[in-house]
Amino acid sequence: MIPGQYQIQPGDIELNAGRRTHSLTVANSGDRPIQVGSHFHFFETNDALTFDRAASRGMRLNIPAGTAVRFEPGQSREVELVDLAGLREVYGFAGRVMGALD
């Protein structure tokens, strides 16, 4: 093995396998672009984003880690969300949960 070398199994890796997903239509009602990262608790995003906020509680964007989705002013788009995993506790972000989700 060469230092730093990766040994990866052949084939595709399925992200978030077996987790519940939900699609939502999201619109930016503000006058500035809003960018949401892959692991941000979607329920707590900028208030200028209009969508069914209650349906997004305990979920994040179903996109690869380290990436983001940008919502331009006046733009509406459909996004897919995926359940948060692990302990399902949320702290920080906009401070709207600060504890267990379930």
From Swiss-Prot:
It is found in: Cytoplasm. GO terms for cellular component: urease complex. Pathway: Nitrogen metabolism; urea degradation; CO(2) and NH(3) from urea (urease route): step 1/1. It catalyses: urea + 2 H2O + H(+) = hydrogencarbonate + 2 NH4(+). InterPro entries: Urease_beta-like, Urease_betasu_sf, Urease_subunit. One of its GO terms (biological process) is urea catabolic process. GO terms for molecular function: urease activity. CDD domains: Urease_beta. It holds the Pfam family Urease_beta. Keywords: Cytoplasm, Hydrolase. It comes from the Bacteria. It is an enzyme of class 3 (hydrolase). Belongs to the urease beta subunit family. Heterotrimer of UreA (gamma), UreB (beta) and UreC (alpha) subunits. Three heterotrimers associate to form the active enzyme. This is Urease subunit beta. The lineage of its organism: Bacteria, Pseudomonadati, Pseudomonadota, Gammaproteobacteria, Pseudomonadales.
